[in-house]
Amino acid sequence: MLHSALSSIFANGIRKRRMNQINKSHRSLCGAKFLIGAVTLFLALAGTGCNDNLSHVGGSVMPPKDALYPHADTLHFDAHSVDIDSVYDRSTYSLLGELSDPLYGNLRASYISRFQYARDYHTEFEPIGGAIDSTFIEVSYAKWVGDSTVWSKVTAYEVKQKLPESRYSGDVQPYLKGASYLGALTYRAGNATGVHKLRIPVSKELGMRFYKASKEHPEYFASQEAFEENLLRGIYLHSTTGNGCMLSVYSTSLVLSYRYQKSDTTRTGADTTYIATAEESFVNTKQLYLHRQFETDRGDVLKKPNSDYAFITSPQGLALSLSVNADELSKTFLKQGSGNTRLINEAALTLAVDPPDVRGSVLQPATYLLLLPADSLGHFFEMGETERSQSNIAFLSSAYNITSRTYVFANISRLIQAHLTKHIHVNDKGVATLDEPLKLIALPVTRETMSGNRNVTATISNYIYPSGARIRLNNGQVRIGVVTTIYAKD
């Protein structure tokens, strides 16, 4: 009963056929997508009002019972900002530094990096005197936000507490108990394009610990667990001073530097020996858990109810909540009249961005937003989904347009229909009811594409980069134009 009733309310099979099939049987008609041309004529009317009946289509070429009636509706989504308590991410990217924005507030970022063990590790060459000369924490970055002329300071600590196996950002303070100071560096961000590196000098004792273990305890390099239990759990990098610049870090390494005697042959064939320098690195990888901490101070102010604006920020900032109540959904999609069936053809969502009205704002809108049901948020990132693998519920916006200042979701009709199909209940008399509101969330994401095909998404991740967008609202709402088609049932 439920399946047949839902099928009569939402026929989702009218797709991709031409108008020259219009005189075929009613069964063929239900399987065709000849409606596209007719529906397109009414797209402009979709956002202008509610329940606007349009002229019927096909009256002169079809039996009366088969006449098609395009219909324009507007769904009113209540919109406001909500906290993103933590963000899930599998990458090696993090942020380091402190940034102030007059609209979005202060943002500070620090992190704990773990390092991949090297099985059966030994130094490639024998260090002179059996000594590691220097040890560094190397922070590699290609981008930064803010003022590159600001002097900042980063301090490195060795973490002594066992770290959780979690890819969610959060408070790292509980894991800093007993942490020991290793070193610090004062720096300014590099202005030139390309890869930049910070080299934080740390205690040579850390490098010697690795060297001695390679000689005396090779079992410490047998597994990641043994490595962290006996040698190094992680390094905490903390932004201590300097406000105005934040680095986008893509790699963190522990570097051991030592001198060794190198034998070679000169151009004349004579043997020679000289002192050379070698460096060996332990790196963080995607297989390890990176523990990020993001601190902001204006989230409570920005998420207060506002009839004109809502805010979207990253990382671990604010997302846009969109919800439409069950009563409005029922009025729009269930009351199509006796003997009629309604098809959802088009549902276009555009989010308009207003530039900040304060001077000195440094945060820019993220390139992409992801729209999906609020209850699917955690599962989506944990399972590594994309808008292709979850095409019925997840929608990626077009790239942010700096000219029109908009994010566009071209057609989210499948998302609406998926909600209706899941939550409509049909009683014994065939009467359909709906009592579950549609709750969506839009948040900043990073999109990576397939090699050789920039049109195909490979991965979608939370946006680990400072961003901010002020979304324009209409009396606390966002309106979505919906075009449907009503046709007579057999």
Go through each PLM region and give its residues.
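Secreted, disulfide-rich extracellular signaling modules
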Residues: 2-490
